[in-house]
C-alpha cells in the first residue's frame, strides 16, 4: 500500500480522556458493566505504557453524560495534520463529536466533518496512507462513503468492506502490528480483502480479545 513506512504506528503524542463513572452504562456487545474502579486502574496502567513508549499525553476531562466517551477514537480520527469529526451511531453518543471538535480542533490545520451517515473510528483501520473502513452496525455505507471522500481529498486511498457478523467494530478483532502484518481473529482471517493484500497472524479460538491491541512505536499494547 502507498504511504510513508511506519507512519501508522510511529507516535509522538496521544489524546486520551479521563474515565467517567457512567462507563458502567457503556454500550457492550457482551452486555458487560465494567467496574469504575477497575477501569481507573487499567487507565492508569495505560498512561504509564504510553509514557514508557515516549509519548506526550493530552488528557481530556471526563464526560459523565456520555458513558462511552473514554473511547476518543470513535468520534474523531486524525490524518496527517488534519482532524476528521465522525458521526457515532448510537443516540447516547451524539454529542461527543461536537465536544471533541471544540476541545482539540484548534490544534489541527483542517477540521473536516462527516455530514451524512454514521461512522465510528473503531471501524477504521489506518495503514499508512491507506484506510480500510468496515461496514457494521455502527458504520453504514453512507457514512463510509462520506469519510472516504474526505480522506481521498487529503491524498489517501480507501477500501470499504463488510465487518463479519457479531463483531461490534471492524477493529474489535483485528489490529495492525506492522506495515503489512495484521493480527486477526478467525472470523477476520476469512475476509478476502485482508487475505489477498496482507500477511495475517490468526489468533487461536478463545483469544479473540487479544486482536484488539495497538502498536505504539516499538511496543505492542494488549
Listing of model-derived features with the role each one plays in the protein:
Residues 2-222:
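The feature marks the mature, well-folded catalytic cores of soluble enzymes
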Amino acid at each position: 500500500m502507498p504511504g510513508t513506512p511506519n507512519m501508522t504506528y510511529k507516535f509522538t503524542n496521544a489524546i486520551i480522556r479521563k474515565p467517567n463513572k457512567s462507563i458502567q452504562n457503556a454500550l457492550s456487545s457482551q452486555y458487560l458493566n465494567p467496574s469504575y474502579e477497575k477501569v481507573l486502574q487499567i487507565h492508569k496502567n495505560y498512561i504509564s505504557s504510553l509514557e514508557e513508549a515516549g509519548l506526550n499525553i493530552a488528557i481530556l476531562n471526563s464526560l459523565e453524560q456520555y458513558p462511552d466517551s473514554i473511547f476518543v477514537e470513535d468520534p474523531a480520527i486524525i490524518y496527517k495534520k488534519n482532524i476528521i469529526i465522525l458521526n457515532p451511531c448510537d443516540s447516547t453518543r451524539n454529542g461527543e463529536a461536537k465536544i471533541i471538535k471544540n476541545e482539540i480542533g484548534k490544534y489541527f490545520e483542517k477540521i473536516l466533518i462527516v455530514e451524512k451517515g454514521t461512522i465510528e473510528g473503531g471501524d477504521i483501520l489506518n495503514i499508512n496512507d491507506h484506510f480500510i473502513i468496515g461496514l457494521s452496525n455502527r458504520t453504514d455505507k453512507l457514512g463510509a462513503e462520506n469519510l472516504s471522500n474526505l480522506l481521498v481529498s487529503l491524498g489517501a486511498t480507501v477500501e470499504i468492506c463488510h465487518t463479519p457478523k457479531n463483531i461490534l467494530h471492524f477493529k474489535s478483532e483485528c489490529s495492525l502490528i506492522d506495515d503489512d502484518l495484521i493480527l486477526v481473529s478467525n472470523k477476520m482471517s476469512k475476509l478476502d480483502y485482508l487475505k489477498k493484500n496482507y500477511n495475517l497472524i490468526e489468533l487461536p479460538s478463545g483469544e479473540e480479545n487479544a486482536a484488539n491491541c495497538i502498536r505504539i512505536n516499538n511496543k505492542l499494547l494488549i
